[in-house]
Amino acid sequence: MNNPIPSNLKSEAKKAAKILREFTEITSRNGPDKIIPAHVIAKAKGLAVLSVIKAGFLVTARGGSGIVLARLPDGKWSAPSAIGIAGLGGGFEIGIEVSDLVIILNYDRAVEAFAKGGNLTLGGNFTVAVGPLGRNLEGNVSLRSSAAVFTYCKSRGLFAGISLEGSCLIERKETNRKFYCQDIRAYDILFGDVPQPAQAEDLYEILNSFTEKYETEGQRINLKKVAREQRKAKELPPKPSSRPQPAHPPVQLNAGSQGNRNEYKLYPELSSYHEKTGNLNQPIEVTALYSFEGQQPGDLNFQAGDRIIVISKTDSNFDWWEGKLRGQTGIFPANYVTMN
């Protein structure tokens, strides 16, 4: 395991890069389902990487060191700020254990709370959850978590559950002062007042790789969506072959059968719903099962799920009917809809 004893910021950045690789690369001990997904880090608003030592005898004490970074408005990562972690816990654990931690800050408010206050108590005002594992979890329901903080812990090379409730991330002001050669607060570091240091080049290289992996995964997912849409389009039912021909000019309906209303039929060869039933108060409404994009003038465009008012219809579902949607009137294939 890595050294939990506080050291200079250059060493902490080097340690953080090593820990991130161990948490995200597939090895003989880490299969594809045992790594931090690239998109979790790519979407993170902030990130803390630490080594922690835990000692227990009736009461457990936890302490360690590491760094924290924040995502800047331009999408780049800030310079690192040195941090420590401290906490107490109950239980009857006896012994000493060293662990590596990766803490994902999912919201800007979690980053701001640390940056402005110089410390952040986990589980206080922010919900903490064990982070998801596996590189193919982008669409997984479990990722729709509202947790402000994800935690990952490795002990003896294996992922392990760890409760960080009550643990506090603490700003190491003196370490930052020595590295940046000035009195500077975590707030200024995390909000971009100093450039990325060359001494942390290895760390930024691996952080940027997560964004590249995530974008590649996103492109692959989009290609799958396009392929699904193309397959779906090919599976659309065939449209009726013969189309009704519009009258020029439209034919006036029998005024007596329409309650003395002056209405006109654009497609007189289609039977009027009102003429057949005499029901003026309850027009037929159908719901689109498929999307239909008109290919000729007079076609009625609609999306799957749209509700269409039927103006004229035939007795066959494999035919063209006339309908009205969002103020537009036109004909559509009846086998693309279902009666409500």
From Swiss-Prot:
Q: Where is the composition biased (Basic and acidic residues)?
A: 226-237
Region entry Disordered, spans: 226-259
Q: What biological-process terms (Gene Ontology) are attached? A: phosphatidylinositol biosynthetic process; regulation of ruffle assembly
Instruction: Pinpoint the SH3 domain residues.
Output: 281-340
Q: Provide ranges: composition bias, Pro residues.
A: 238-249
Q: Name the organs or tissues of expression.
A: Expressed in skin, kidney, stomach, small intestine and colon. Highly expressed in the anagen hair follicle. In hair, it is expressed predominantly in the hair bulb, the hair shaft, inner root sheath, and outer root sheath in the lower half of the follicle.
Question: In which domain of life is the source organism classified?
Answer: Eukaryota
Q: Name one GO cellular component term.
A: ruffle membrane
Alphabetic keyword roster: SH3 domain
GO MF terms here are: phosphatase binding; phosphatidylinositol binding
Q: Which PROSITE patterns match?
A: SH3
Key word Repressor present in the record?
no
Query: Which family is this sequence assigned to?
Result: Belongs to the SH3YL1 family.
Q: Cite the record's note on assembly.
A: Interacts with SH3D19.
Spell out the PANTHER family in the cross-references. Answer: SH3 DOMAIN-CONTAINING YSC84-LIKE PROTEIN 1, SH3YL1 PROTEIN
Q: Under which name does UniProt file this protein?
A: SH3 domain-containing YSC84-like protein 1
Instruction: Record the organism.
Output: Mus musculus
Highest lineage ranks of the organism?
A: Eukaryota, Metazoa, Chordata, Craniata, Vertebrata
Q: Which gene encodes it?
A: Sh3yl1
